[in-house]
């Protein structure tokens, strides 16, 4: 009888180690669903009125097409998510004043860093991110996510408007561990 009890106690560390391996596998699987290089697929202005920030006379809620049509240089708007942290590029439009008092709109990249946490609940895991600014991050499927955040942009009449913008990102390249 005492040998059986000794064997049972000797097996406890083995079973605990198995549970930890299972958690590590689950954590890795959850991170694997989101790891990669992403591009913005769409960005929708959620304000009351449509925007005409490029001054072409066509107001729209398609924030990303308005944003890309501004003639203010080019940019690479890729986002990177790895094991420990995430860099998400938020398209922002800024107003810059020249030395003579004139103003112009420029395209700007606003980098926000978040930290990836994998929450394990029962037999499933989900990815959560915490950002410096108020951002709603939602993992919507394998290799895609959405981000909603407030953006302030000037319109073509010089007024600033602030409203949420919902951006959808899709993975264009997988990043290994």
List PLM regions with ranges:
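Bacterial Sec-dependent N-terminal signal peptides
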Residues: 2, 15-41, 169-177
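Sec-dependent signal peptide recognition
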Residues: 3-8
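Hydrophobic helical h-region of N-terminal Sec-dependent signal peptides
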Residues: 9-15
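Short, solvent-exposed loop/hinge segments that bridge or flank secondary-structure elements
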Residues: 40-81
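Short, cysteine-centered beta-strand-loop-beta hairpins and adjacent loop/turn segments enriched
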Residues: 45-51, 84-89, 150-161
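Contiguous, well-ordered beta-strand patches that form the walls/edges
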Residues: 46, 69-144, 170-172
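Edge beta-strand at a domain terminus
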Residues: 97, 143-177
């Amino acid at each position: 009888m005492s040998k059986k009890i000794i064997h049972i106690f000797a097996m406890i560390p083995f079973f605990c180690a198995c549970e930890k391996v299972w958690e590590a596998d689950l954590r890795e699987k959850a991170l694997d669903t989101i790891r990669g290089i992403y591009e913005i697929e769409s960005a929708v202005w959620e304000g009351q009125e449509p925007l005409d920030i490029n001054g072409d006379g066509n107001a729209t809620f398609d924030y990303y097409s308005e944003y890309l049509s501004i003639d203010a240089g080019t940019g690479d708007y890729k986002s990177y998510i790895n094991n420990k942290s995430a860099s998400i590029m938020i398209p922002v439009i800024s107003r810059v004043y020249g030395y003579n008092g004139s103003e112009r709109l420029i395209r700007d990249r606003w980098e926000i860093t978040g930290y990836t946490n994998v929450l394990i609940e029962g037999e499933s895991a989900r990815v959560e991110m915490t950002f410096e600014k108020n951002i709603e991050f939602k993992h919507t499927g394998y290799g895609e996510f959405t981000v909603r955040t407030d953006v302030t942009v000037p319109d073509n009449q010089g007024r600033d408007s602030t409203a949420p913008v919902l951006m959808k990102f899709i993975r264009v390249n997988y990043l290994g561990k």
